[in-house]
Amino acid sequence: MTPILFIDRDGTLIEEPSDFQIDAYEKLRFVPQVIPALLKLRDAGYQFVIVTNQDGLGSDSYPRASFDGPNELMLQIFESQGITFRDVLIDCSWPQDNAPTRKPGIGLMTAYLQDRSIDWARSGMVGDRITDLQFAENLNIRGFQLRTEQFGGEWDWPGIAHALADAPRIAVVQRDTKETKIRVELDLDRAGDARIDTGLPFFDHMLEQIGKHGGFALDIQAEGDLHIDEHHTIEDTGLALGQALREALGDKRGIGRYGFTLPMDETLASAALDFSGRPYFVFEGEFKRERVGDMPTELVPHFFRSLCDASGLNLNLQVRGDNDHHKVEACFKALARALRPALARQGTALPTTKGAL
């Protein structure tokens, strides 16, 4: 089955002028990043259909000849870049006509609604107006309102391509107990600066290493009973992060099983991991200091054990060295560097002969 992306024209593929009519070549300007985004979606198997309202097209105020030239040039430019459209559907009515073929109406969609080869679950609609979102709702497909000065909106083309083509592995976990409130958000397919606040600055710094060196977007916000002890905050953060990893990975298709050895001055840390679904943690290392910064060193292996329990991760972690700060940081970095290739998707096969992980 084939997914289709239905796309508005003015304000979505090409920028909309102040008079809302692209009736001259000099008015033709492409929306930023639209071509790379459509190429990515094309490579993901999408076909494209333009669905546009052109108020009074063919009337004296908007002659067809004024529309056709810029429109044909637009299509030729897209085609020169490898982008073709399965169809261009145009409604020429006025808003006051209330024509069923005018968006958000779906009168132009009859043939598509009867086409059983379309993957409607993956299909979507992109436009710059609320009527485009209503059109998507009427088709029961996902709608994206492109961000514009005229009509607002939340999306840009790279974000839309990521959302549709990458099937992004995103998770949001809220863990509330009597002792803590932990919120973890992550996107395994998007790199970004980690946003961490647990009330423990050194622990924050260690968690930042997981996002930065793991190559994924990570946001952790934690409130805990730090006036009593650090234990609950560190443990519950590990559990919430582990749960988020498990949820974002889904059925684990295409992922790998990896290890990484990381030196940090006199310290050497090694992490070997497997998202086997059977949590197990082995730690080899010793700390001389009771705490590093505001983090008790006895809770370092406890954090990793909590992470493994909640994510279904098998982790073997070894560290040796003289400086406890270096050893703790090397543990987090080694885990993150082992996570980076393990989380990367390569194909769609499951890395097991059992049929499930």
Swiss-Prot record:
Its required cofactor(s), as named, are: Mg(2+)
| Ranges where the record places region Histidinol-phosphatase | 1-168
- Alphabetic keyword roster: Amino-acid biosynthesis, Cytoplasm, Histidine biosynthesis, Hydrolase, Lyase, Magnesium, Metal-binding, Multifunctional enzyme
User: Which residues lie within the region annotated Imidazoleglycerol-phosphate dehydratase?
Assistant: 169-357
* Coiled-coil regions, chain positions: none
- Where's it found, cell-wise? Cytoplasm
Matching Pfam families: IGPD, PNK3P
Enumerate the InterPro entries for this protein.
HAD-like_sf, HAD-SF_hydro_IIIA, HAD_sf, His_synth_bifunc_HisB, HisB_N, Histidinol-phos, IGPD_sf, ImidazoleglycerolP_deHydtase
Catalytic reaction equation(s): D-erythro-1-(imidazol-4-yl)glycerol 3-phosphate = 3-(imidazol-4-yl)-2-oxopropyl phosphate + H2O; L-histidinol phosphate + H2O = L-histidinol + phosphate
Q: What EC number(s) are associated with this protein in UniProt? A: 3.1.3.15, 4.2.1.19
GO CC annotations, alphabetized: cytoplasm
Q: In which pathway does it act?
A: Amino-acid biosynthesis; L-histidine biosynthesis; L-histidine from 5-phospho-alpha-D-ribose 1-diphosphate: step 6/9; Amino-acid biosynthesis; L-histidine biosynthesis; L-histidine from 5-phospho-alpha-D-ribose 1-diphosphate: step 8/9
**MF term (GO), any:** metal ion binding
Which residues does the entry assign to the active site, renumbered to this chain?
A: D8 (nucleophile), D10 (proton donor)
Q: Which PROSITE patterns match?
A: IGP_DEHYDRATASE_1, IGP_DEHYDRATASE_2
Q: Where does Mg(2+) bind?
A: D8, D10, D128
What GO terms in the biological process aspect are recorded for it?
Answer: L-histidine biosynthetic process
Q: Does the keyword Metal-binding apply?
A: yes
The main location class comes to: cytoplasm
Which family is this sequence assigned to?
In the N-terminal section; belongs to the histidinol-phosphatase family. In the C-terminal section; belongs to the imidazoleglycerol-phosphate dehydratase family.
- The protein in question is named Histidine biosynthesis bifunctional protein HisB
